[in-house]
């Protein structure tokens, strides 16, 4: 085994993959390819490093891109709108369907759709508020905008929105969507489970939000919104070579503080295990790009054959870097 070094006396001691190109180790459950085997696997993992902690691993090339980063109405923690120029070289020039199993603000998918580089996009999120928002943008556009038209961006409106998000069960879709939008716009960094932003009085901009929502709604025939477990979505859409899976799960180190639907250690391991199983056992299907925070855990989870890791810089609040605007 190339991972743990275990030696086996015969093939009866190992589990060969269905294509006969390698085997699964019974000791560490990792995959080892046979010598001389080349696989058609299109899997890249982007590990985000802090702007003040990139050192020699950081690759800061500036890339010209046709992808716009300010299309989503949402402010989203970990959103990829500011990183599109860095991620763009790893995206397909054109794809039939782009799928985001952890949609969030959906900045990457919207950029690909509006640039004409994706024919359709699939936005999935398990967070009830996020799902309600995107389904309302497409199906109940004017109802959603009417629900927030008279919002002034006050602390009381923010707290009421948070109360709705804390108890989403049984809420009408548009009510939940409006609450999510209000909390997202007024919260610190768009974190709806956090406190209100210090400059909340200036955060609410109905015209900008309405313009972006209506622009997205114009593409409703090319956007599918789902509310499923992300692993099920990955399994469903992996098998088509004309699909692009952009997998942007909750951060490992701060996920619980940032998201209402976060991942525990076992969840991160299951996700990495599924991606490993699909790409190694059934290569040549969908293109996959995974984004994560750079840390020892993610380095370990994605330490398997044929994965192309690259490091990108994200600006965080710190003493030596300046954040860009939302």
Give each language-model segment a name.
Residues 265-326:
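Long, positively charged, glycine-interspersed low-complexity recognition regions
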Residues 5-8, 32:
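Cys/His-rich microdomains that often coordinate metals
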Residues 94-165:
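SAM cofactor-binding core of SAM-dependent methyltransferases
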Residues 12-22:
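Short linker/helix segments within small regulatory modules
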Residues 59-86, 93, 138-246, 250-257, ...:
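SAM-dependent nucleic-acid methyltransferase catalytic core
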Residues 1, 22, 49:
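Residues immediately within or flanking Cys/His clusters that coordinate Zn2+
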Residues 1-4, 25-28:
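Short cysteine-rich clusters marking metal-coordination/redox-active sites
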Residues 27-46:
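Short metal-binding segments enriched for Cys and/or His
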């Amino acid at each position: 085994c190339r991972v743990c070094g275990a030696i086996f006396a015969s093939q009866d001691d190992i589990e060969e993959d269905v294509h006969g190109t390698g085997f699964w180790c019974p000791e560490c459950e990792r995959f080892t390819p046979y010598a001389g085997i080349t696989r058609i696997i299109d899997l890249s993992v982007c590990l985000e490093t802090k702007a003040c902690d990139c050192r020699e691993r950081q690759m800061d090339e500036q890339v010209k891109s046709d992808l716009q980063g300010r299309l989503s109405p949402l402010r989203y923690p970990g959103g990829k709108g500011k990183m599109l120029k860095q991620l763009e070289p790893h995206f397909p020039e054109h794809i039939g369907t782009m799928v985001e199993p952890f949609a969030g603000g959906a900045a990457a998918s919207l950029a690909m759709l509006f640039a004409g580089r994706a024919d359709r996009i699939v936005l999935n999120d398990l967070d009830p508020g996020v799902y309600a928002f995107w389904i309302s943008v497409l199906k109940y556009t004017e109802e959603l905008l009417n629900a927030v038209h008279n919002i002034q961006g006050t602390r009381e409106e923010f707290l009421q929105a948070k109360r709705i998000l804390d108890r989403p069960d049984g809420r009408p879709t548009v009510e939940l969507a409006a609450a999510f939008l209000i909390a997202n716009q007024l919260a610190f960094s768009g974190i709806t489970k956090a406190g209100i932003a210090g400059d909340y009085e200036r955060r609410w901009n109905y015209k900008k939000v309405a313009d972006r929502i209506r622009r997205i709604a114009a593409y409703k025939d090319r956007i599918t919104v789902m509310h499923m477990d992300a692993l099920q979505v990955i399994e469903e859409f992996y098998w088509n070579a004309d699909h692009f899976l952009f997998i942007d799960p909750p951060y490992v180190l701060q996920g619980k503080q940032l998201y209402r639907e976060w991942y525990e250690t076992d969840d991160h391991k299951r996700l990495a295990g599924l991606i490993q199983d699909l790409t190694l056992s059934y290569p040549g299907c969908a293109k996959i790009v995974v984004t994560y925070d750079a840390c020892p855990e993610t380095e370990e989870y994605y330490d398997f054959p044929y994965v192309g890791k690259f490091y990108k810089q994200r600006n965080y609040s710190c003493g030596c870097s300046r954040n860009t605007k939302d």
